[in-house]
Amino acid sequence: MPTLHVNVVTPDGKVYEGDVDMVSVKTVEGELGILPRHIPLVAPLTVGAVRLKKGSTVDLVAVSGGFVEVRPDQVTILAEAAELPSDIDVERARSAKERAEKRLQQAKQENIDFKRAELSLRRATNRLDVAGR
């Protein structure tokens, strides 16, 4: 059975590389499932978990925006930030989530950038979800 070679890369370097059966990413248009021999495309990513399926195993990578480039036998994810579950500092993510929630509450009363606080909350929640906490 054919596989896809996947690279997840950030400005800091490579986060993941391997051959998988299927890749699922969250684009700004919605979920995208990618199988071998998929048509070439480039799509912008949003905050979400990248699911990398190989047999009965599913690996997760927390991604905070970027782009996915798909070729028939290769997928490259150029992410602003990406972390494997083992690399996520759960306490730091929980603290970030709490700070973002407080900022969102203040945004209703003060002149705080609501979209920025909302994005911080989505990033922290995604990291906690991928870490399984």
From Swiss-Prot:
Entry superkingdom: Bacteria
Keywords: ATP synthesis, Cell membrane, CF(1), Hydrogen ion transport, Ion transport, Membrane, Transport
InterPro entries: ATP_F1_dsu/esu_C_sf (IPR036794), ATP_synth_F1_dsu/esu (IPR001469), ATP_synth_F1_dsu/esu_N (IPR020546), ATP_synth_F1_esu_C (IPR020547), ATPsynth_dsu/esu_N (IPR036771)
Membrane topology, as annotated: Peripheral membrane protein
Compartment(s) where it occurs, according to its Swiss-Prot or TrEMBL record: Cell membrane
Subunit text: F-type ATPases have 2 components, CF(1) - the catalytic core - and CF(0) - the membrane proton channel. CF(1) has five subunits: alpha(3), beta(3), gamma(1), delta(1), epsilon(1). CF(0) has three main subunits: a, b and c.
Protein name from the UniProt record: ATP synthase epsilon chain
